[in-house]
């Protein structure tokens, strides 16, 4: 991934297996969120490829990448990106505009322990409750790939551990890749990647390899 100062983050031959959960650990600025954005098709690498289900996202137009992300990828953003003045149900049902079937919403909210909040405005929720709503919105699509950027960043360890457990348990066979700063959560995942070792910075270079 290239930056305006000519530097680059390089990820070489990273491969993620189906139906596995991955924790991405590493210091701030080591490229964890950048990797998620590459996998989501939000960013494009300066060189190399990003292949998901046999499709190279770098060969798709931005519109095609957006369509692929809507259909195949669930992204849980660090800042949630929920509409505060709308209810929990309305935030999830907005996905209908993108062709997503949300008929399983009640069952999913029940599994996440927030069905009672279905008709409550998001602005009235706690940080942990908003986190679960963001998870529900991502999982309602039954995505093949689930990306989570610091899904426990605003929570204490005990609450964060419960959220991670719920995320993994409700992934419904999808591959989960989650950024976390808390090494204590690592044992919850099938595999752990130390991004300080996986990614490297090059001054004046360009991104190489395949994700």
Where would I find each of the regions flagged by the language model?
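Conserved ABC transporter NBD signature motif
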Residues: 48-56
């Amino acid at each position: 991934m290239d930056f305006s100062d000519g530097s680059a983050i390089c990820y070489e031959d990273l491969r993620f297996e189906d139906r596995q959960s991955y924790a991405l650990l590493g210091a701030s600025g080591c490229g964890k969120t950048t990797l998620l954005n590459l996998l989501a098709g939000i960013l494009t690498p300066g060189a190399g490829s990003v292949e998901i289900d046999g499709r190279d996202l770098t060969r798709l137009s931005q519109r095609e990448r957006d369509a692929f992300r809507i259909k195949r990828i669930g992204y849980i953003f660090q800042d949630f990106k929920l509409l505060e003045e709308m209810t929990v149900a309305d935030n999830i049902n907005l996905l209908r505009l993108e062709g997503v079937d949300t008929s399983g919403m009640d069952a999913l909210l029940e599994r996440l322990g927030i069905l009672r909040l279905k008709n409550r405005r998001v602005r009235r929720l706690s940080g942990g409750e908003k986190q679960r709503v963001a998870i529900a919105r991502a999982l309602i699509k039954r995505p093949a790939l689930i990306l989570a950027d610091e899904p426990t960043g605003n929570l204490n360890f005990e609450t964060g551990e419960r959220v991670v457990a719920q995320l993994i348990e409700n992934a419904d066979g999808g591959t989960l890749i989650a950024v976390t700063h808390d090494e204590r959560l690592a044992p919850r995942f099938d595999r752990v990647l130390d991004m300080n070792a996986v990614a490297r910075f090059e001054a004046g270079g360009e991104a190489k390899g395949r994700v």
